[in-house]
Each structure stands twice: as C-alpha cells, then as structure tokens.
Amino acid sequence: MFPFEDENLPLFTVGQVADMLRVQQAFLRRLDEFGVVRPSRSPGGQRRYSRTEVTIVRYVAELADGGMTLAAIRRVLELEEQVKALEAERDELLAALAERDERLAALARRVRFDQGS
C-alpha cells in the first residue's frame, strides 16, 4: 500500500481541512478541545487530519449545522462506535456458533454411522 492510500495517515493541516469543508479553523480546534475529533499532532504540535478524520469532521459539521451541540455530537459518535464494536462481536459469535453447529452435525453423522455399523 502506498502511503497516500492509507485513510488514517495524518496529511492535512487545520487550514487545509477548513478550506476543504468550508468551516472555520476555530470550529476544528473546538472539535479537538471537546474531544469530538482528535487529530494527530505533527512533531511541531500542529494538528494533522487523516482522510478518515476529514470524513468524520464533515459529518460532525452537518450535525452541528442541524443544531446539535458538540456534547450531543460526541455522544452520537461514541454510540456509533459502540454499535460497530457490538456488531463485530456479534459477527464473531455468529461465526463461532456456525463452527460449533458444524462440529455438532459432524458428530451426529459419526454417531449415526457408528450406530448403523
């Protein structure tokens, strides 16, 4: 993978993100201060946003434009992360359950075969 293909590579400055999304730089700083979007920092301490974070900021800006407070937006993002984690856990459990069902079916076939002998 080339570095520019990495969605999580911190590439963009506050000014670049503000220009891309047509938001104020102060808005981006507030998102960081309130823990809504926490970009990486350069060695010099400047905020650097990945493409993933830019996408999140775009979403956050839409929610803020709709009248949501930063505290409410942070909670929405937290809940969405919890949903993703729970969905991943559910998928793992379903896979384990399917594997167990396959083992049980194989054992049942073996028992039927052994009883038929």
Predicted regions and their residues:
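Short coil turns linking two alpha-helices in DNA-binding domains
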Residues: Q24-F27
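Alpha-helical DNA-recognition elements
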Residues: R30, F34-V36
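Beta-hairpin "wing" of winged helix-turn-helix
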Residues: R38-G44
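Minor-groove-contacting beta-hairpin "wing" of winged helix-turn-helix DNA-binding domains
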Residues: G45-R51
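Arg/Lys-rich, alpha-helical DNA-contact motif
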Residues: M1-P10, D19, E33, R51-S117
